[in-house]
Swiss-Prot record:
List of catalytic residues: 127 (s-palmitoyl cysteine intermediate)
Entry keywords, A to Z: Acyltransferase, Golgi apparatus, Lipoprotein, Membrane, Palmitate, Transferase, Transmembrane, Transmembrane helix
Protein's name in the database: Probable protein S-acyltransferase 16
Gene that encodes the chain: PAT16
Protein task: Palmitoyl acyltransferase.
Major location category of this protein: Golgi
Swiss-Prot/TrEMBL domain comment: The DHHC domain is required for palmitoyltransferase activity.
Matching PROSITE patterns: DHHC
GO molecular function terms attached to this record: protein-cysteine S-palmitoyltransferase activity
InterPro entries cross-referenced by the UniProt entry: Palmitoyltrfase_DHHC, PFA4/ZDH16/20/ERF2-like
Reaction equations catalysed: L-cysteinyl-[protein] + hexadecanoyl-CoA = S-hexadecanoyl-L-cysteinyl-[protein] + CoA
GO CC terms of this entry: Golgi membrane
Record family assignment: Belongs to the DHHC palmitoyltransferase family.
Organism: Arabidopsis thaliana (Mouse-ear cress)
Amino acid sequence: MKRKGVGFSLPVTVVMLVIGFIYFASVFTFIDRWFSLTSSPGIANAAAFTALALMCIYNYSIAVFRDPGRVPLNYMPDVEDPESPVHEIKRKGGDLRYCQKCSHFKPPRAHHCRVCKRCVLRMDHHCIWINNCVGHTNYKVFFVFVVYAVTACVYSLVLLVGSLTVEPQDEEEEMGSYLRTIYVISAFLLIPLSIALGVLLGWHIYLILQNKTTIEYHEGVRAMWLAEKGGQVYKHPYDIGAYENLTLILGPNILSWLCPTSRHIGSGVRFRTAFDSIPDSSETKH
């Protein structure tokens, strides 16, 4: 579902400009200088990097424009449902989770976003770089975008370094001030981006393998401390095993893990837990 009221965003504009700059620098400077765009290796690398850039832009656009997941207006928790053994409660008191700002009950894993001013299903965090929340319906495309972005940054760095190893054939091919500027700006962008996005990718791989959101991780730290204090062992209720966790987020078909598909994600108001004996049909629908 497409978001409503999406306007101009400076961070999104910056991201698109950076993607554009890195693409043109990689193809028309690094690849051309290293292989020449008229050679077979040059054409192959240009085609591969172009495909990578297109996947970055496509997944990024979906993450920006797709609604992260709205709580249904008629949502009401069924405390007597035997197939839903886990009901999240407020941190204080024993009432079911109710959003005072939205004036409705919140499903498990949903949280209110102060920026979006509404509750988001399976909210992970609000990301300024996509001007949107990362939630139930756009989490996978956000993750896939990060995968492609890390790959593109590392690929571009390899092309940058490789193109510097080429000895100029004559004085006309010596690097001028224009090329130096491109190389300096590219290195200034690619090195910190590769590190930052690599750390972000590693973090979300860890979360996916545990079937946690960023919010749930921080809540789990406190829950683990309280459990240990009471002589108990805390287990994240939605952790059903590493591979099962992967398939719940990325899909049952390994070949589609890096594609922006989302037909497998279910409604977002109920989730499989470690206490379930039979998988929820909404979560296993292909």
